[in-house]
């Protein structure tokens, strides 16, 4: 028996497949290979593999758009059985006969629903674009806030977004704000039972990513707005999301200010990184959110300039960089135990990277730098996380992984991140410039987490990173994308432990003083005090 495995995201699920099909040979097909060419060419590519079982691995079944199409595709390619597995134990399993028998009705239903959603959304968007967005201000020492998370993707993945949400919500609560959270998924690492938390689950409807997002905007808005009306908040705080208008509709309905956390243009992301499609329509959703918001919180000065260039009034924009929970991310957070688990000796230096293996994180450049570090230098490298470039990095470091010099952990639980960071002596943030030449607009959460850990830091001198960190004081800064400089900086900290320790101590002091989530939340409440 042969299982052909397509890993869209998340865990590759080999262990689960081995459990389901113990006698099977498991053969992988890359996402790039699968997505190359026309539908007929893709079908021929998969047929040529002669699968008995076609398996699709995804992060979360609840968030996998086009499930039915993937399943039917596998059946058309000749697989006797098609399974979809997620990284959290979810499983969908159907026979070829059942899939093909139900295919006409399934495809007709997908097409009809998509058309209805699109027509309805275009009509509603036109109405919302012509509204005037005023609000009443109810000033109080203990404001009530509804926090909206409507991002079209799972919230259970550890990373900067999860840290941001958790950090802001908990800091607002600590400052005396009554916070109610309405989200379309659980949030990694968030387990505060004292804060009301409602989850509006998505529906796996929509053949394309844009249609999936548009449909689930309607699902989320219909459920969230009545909840917000009952909560009667003094302001709504929404993390801006692709194809979303829930905060706009709710703020208009209750006549309260909408505070929009804007981490970057989804239109830009859709054009350069994440090809979601329907960009003209997405641009209208984005403009609607920016116009309806009473205040827009951006993470960097570059993003403020980007918005002003688009005509957003400067008075609406608040620069509010990311932060860190300095009590959670601290020296002595459990690194000694992690080192024992991983077989790392007490006299070995560990240089670590934690984050997404994505286009601008520079993880490929870090892999190339690792190969330039002399083999006789007593240093090991720890890579924590996953993403679209994981396979390429793993391939580049095949020999180093085999020798034990490089360790990959894959995706880890959010609460384990401080322990893994604490296991390191040096932390690396090798971000690279944006591919289209745009100014770097990010505020990487990992920078503040690295600083709070009190470790030596090597980072790219790029955008806000180069403003927050000072060369030779709180980090060694290198030119973005310069592999030789990156390797040299790592070597320097390995060979001069005194400098490494001093940089770490300085960095933690600055993080605790200036870059906590409490300070981030204070800026939100200062904006509330001054709005109106």
PLM regions: where:
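N-terminal subdomain of nucleotide-sugar transferases
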Residues: 1-29, 49, 124-189, 193-194
């Amino acid at each position: 028996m042969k299982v052909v495995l397509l890993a869209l995201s998340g865990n590759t699920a080999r262990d689960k497949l081995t459990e389901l099909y113990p006698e099977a040979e498991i053969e992988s097909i890359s996402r790039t290979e699968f997505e190359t060419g026309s539908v007929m060419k893709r079908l021929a590519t998969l047929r040529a593999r002669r699968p008995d079982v076609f398996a699709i691995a995804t992060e979360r079944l609840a968030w996998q758009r086009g499930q039915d199409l993937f399943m039917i595709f596998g059946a058309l390619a000749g697989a006797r059985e098609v399974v979809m597995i997620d990284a959290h134990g979810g499983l969908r399993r159907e026979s070829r006969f059942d899939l093909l028998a139900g295919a006409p009705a399934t495809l007709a239903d997908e097409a009809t629903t998509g058309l209805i959603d699109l027509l309805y959304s275009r009509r509603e968007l036109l109405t919302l674009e012509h509204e005037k967005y005023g609000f009443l201000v109810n000033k109080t020492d203990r404001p009530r806030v509804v926090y909206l998370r409507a991002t079209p993707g799972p919230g259970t993945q550890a990373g900067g977004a999860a840290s941001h949400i958790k950090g802001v919500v908990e800091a607002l609560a600590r400052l005396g704000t009554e916070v109610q959270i309405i989200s379309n998924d659980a949030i990694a690492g968030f387990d505060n039972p004292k804060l009301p938390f409602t989850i509006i689950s998505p529906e796996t409807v929509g053949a394309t990513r844009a249609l999936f997002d548009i449909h689930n905007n309607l699902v989320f808005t219909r459920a969230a707005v009545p909840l917000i009306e009952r909560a009667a908040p003094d302001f709504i705080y929404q993390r801006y999301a692709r194809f979303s208008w829930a905060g706009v509709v709710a703020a208009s309905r209750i006549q309260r200010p909408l505070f929009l956390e804007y981490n970057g243009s989804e239109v830009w992301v859709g054009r350069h990184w994440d090809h979601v499609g329907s960009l003209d329509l997405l641009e209208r959703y984005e403009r609607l959110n920016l116009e309806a918001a009473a205040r827009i919180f951006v993470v960097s000065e570059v993003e403020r300039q980007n918005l002003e260039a688009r005509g957003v009034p400067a008075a609406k924009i608040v620069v509010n960089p990311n932060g860190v929970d300095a009590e959670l991310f601290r020296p002595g957070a459990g690194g000694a135990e992690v080192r024992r688990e991983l077989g790392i000796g007490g006299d070995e230096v560990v240089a670590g990277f934690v984050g997404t293996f994505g286009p601008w994180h520079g993880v490929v450049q870090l892999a190339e730098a690792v190969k330039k570090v002399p083999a006789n230098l007593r240093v090991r490298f720890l890579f924590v996380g996953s993403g679209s470039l994981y396979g390429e990095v793993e391939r580049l470091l095949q020999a180093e992984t085999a020798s034990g010099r490089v360790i990959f952990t894959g995706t880890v639980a959010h609460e384990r991140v401080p322990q893994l960071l604490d296991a390191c002596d040096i932390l690396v943030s090798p971000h690279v410039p944006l591919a289209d030449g745009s100014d770097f607009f990010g505020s990487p959460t990992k920078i503040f987490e690295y600083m709070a850990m009190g470790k030596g830091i090597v980072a790219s001198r790029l955008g806000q990173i180069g403003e927050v960190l000072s060369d030779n004081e709180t980090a060694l800064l290198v030119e973005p994308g310069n592999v030789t400089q990156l390797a040299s900086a790592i070597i320097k900290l390995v060979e001069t432990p005194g400098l490494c320790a001093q940089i770490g101590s300085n960095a933690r002091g600055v993080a605790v003083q200036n870059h906590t989530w409490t300070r981030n939340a204070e800026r939100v409440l200062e904006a509330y005090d001054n709005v109106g």
